[in-house]
């Protein structure tokens, strides 16, 4: 938590006068420029604290390496506004490689009673994590909202993994919660820092993998629970917002990849709710 506060403070001081070519404010109701680099500080604090507290199991390190890569892609998008399809291609590659090499997946084939040598499992798992990443990215549309939602998810995953005696994953969840919590001091309305794509993609990537790993049966890492029902509930808030926004934009002939003020949070604000009340609702 303290590391996150420190790194976010340093980031704020260093980025006050730096305006990237992509201005995330156009997707928010605020006209004031806010640096979108808070996610970098959070990711650095999370990775350092993970290392300091000895959570260096090879699987976690491998996933962490690709989490850094996806954060870099997000940073480049914050700076240079990468085309959505290029970013999507990178997301597919960066998510699929650790899933395949670590042989971890959602056991979707068992759920539907067919066998494709895990090919379908990897496809579904890749889609799931990419969906989570972009849902977290979408819900980062109002001061403090992505922090509140991501923190709630971390807490729920911590309880789930602790219940299943997955204590290392519980520790990782708490460390991620602390990294996000330190950022809240700078993102609570009125925000001084935004997550940016670098942060939302990093957080979404980590949460997505944690959602799969919580079902891990240590005796055989290739076997996972055939259902994601608890996790679907855990991620219901960002997923519902994502699906509502995408469906609405398609229905009016607008590209889902073009940002706007049509999220559930914006609709609540338009009905007269304050930002603090919207955060409480979420």
Question: Which ranges hold each PLM region?
Answer:
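Membrane-embedded alpha-helical core segments of multi-pass
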Residues: 68-69, 90, 94-102, 124-134, ...
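Juxtamembrane helix-capping/reentrant segments at transmembrane boundaries
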Residues: 22-35, 192, 266
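Transmembrane alpha-helix boundary signature
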Residues: 48-58, 76-82, 99-114
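Hydrophobic alpha-helical hairpins/lids featuring a short glycine-rich hinge
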Residues: 63-91
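Short acidic, Gly/Ser-rich segments with clustered Asp/Glu that frequently serve as metal-coordination loops
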Residues: 80-83, 131-153, 200-201
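Alpha-helical transmembrane segments
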Residues: 1-12, 19, 42-72, 146-282
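Transmembrane alpha-helix interface/packing and boundary motifs in multi-pass membrane proteins
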Residues: 74-77, 132-140, 184-193
